[in-house]
Amino acid sequence: MPRPPKWRWVRSEPNVTYFKPVGIPLSMLEEVILTVEELEAIRLKDLEGLEQEECADMMKVSRPTFFRIITSARQKIADALVNGKAIRVEGGNYKVYGEDMRGHGGMRHRHGWYNEED
């Protein structure tokens, strides 16, 4: 029996979920799928400039797991940029904590609010 997936915590659902090269019709594009937690890892490490340990803590994963997530994300983004592929952001094993809810016990899951103690 496989292990149940562990949730990765993200600040919010992405507002933009599709990126494509200009001048190439959608019908001719290959896609790379970037998960929501991979996008969050890129946001925390590369955009916010946080240390890997802090990023892992915020996503509630171990440092080795964070390293695997960020490595996968960077590889997918590099593939899309170098090879002219579209990037679709979707899926993953994540829950949304929301900036105003961090540390308050209540977290928003993709399907509504719940308490950490539940």
From Swiss-Prot:
Segments passing through the bilayer: none
InterPro entries: RNA_pol_sigma_r3/r4-like, UPF0251, WH-like_DNA-bd_sf
Record-linked Pfam families: DUF134
HAMAP family: UPF0251
UniProt similarity note: Belongs to the UPF0251 family.
Protein known as: UPF0251 protein TTE1845
Organism: Caldanaerobacter subterraneus subsp. tengcongensis (strain DSM 15242 / JCM 11007 / NBRC 100824 / MB4)
